[in-house]
Amino acid sequence: AMVEQLQMTAQARHFDFFILSDTTDPDIWLREEAFWATTRAALSGEVGLYYRHRTDNTYRKSGNIRDFCERWGSQYRYMVVLDADSLLEGPTLVEMVRRMELDPQIALVQAPPAPVNRLSFFARMQQFSARVYGQVFNSGFALWVQDDGNYWGHNAIIRIEPFMDHCGLPKLPGVPPLGGEILSHDFVEAAMLREAGWKVVLDHDLQGSYEQCPTNLID
C-alpha cells in the first residue's frame, strides 16, 4: 500500500524499501523471503524492494538499524524507520523528505503515529483516546520541546550521516536492568543528536502516520 501510494505521487523513483529481518525462527524466515519475492515480482520496478536477514541479532533493533547503516547508509541521505506494525502514507513520506531538504540542520523528524486496527477493549481505549486528544497532546508537546524533540523509534525520518556519527550506543557497565544493552535506544539516540547540535523535531501536523498498538498490558 505504501509503494502504491508513493507511485501516485510521482516520486516513487526516489525511494527504496528494505525489509530488515531479525527473526530467529527459520519458518518465519522462509515465509518472509517468500512474501518478499512475491511482492517484488508484483511491483513495477520503479521502487527497489530489498530483503536482509541477520543470523546474529546482536543489540536487537538498534543493532538491526546499525547493520543497515553500515552496509547501505552511504548510499542514502535519509532513512525512514518503520516497525513491522507501522506505516506512513505516500504523501506523508514525500512531505517528510521535503522538510528535511528545507532545513539542513534537522537530523530527525518524528511523525506522530495514530494507533489503528486493533479490536481488544484495551486497544480500542487507546485508539479512542488518541482520536479524542492525540492532536492536542502532540501540538502541545511540539510547542514545548521545539528543536529538543524526541524519537519514538519508528515513523520518523533520520539524516543518516549524523545518526552514524553520533548515535553509536555503548553497552552499560553492570548487570541488567541498569547495565548491559540500552533497550530504549530511541530516546538516547535523540539526546545524542541534540548534544551534537542537530535539531530533533516532532512535526505534529503530519498526517498519514499509523501504528498498531498493544492489545493488552502484557504485550
Region annotations inferred by a language model:
Residues 1-219:
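Internal catalytic domains of large membrane-associated glycosyltransferases
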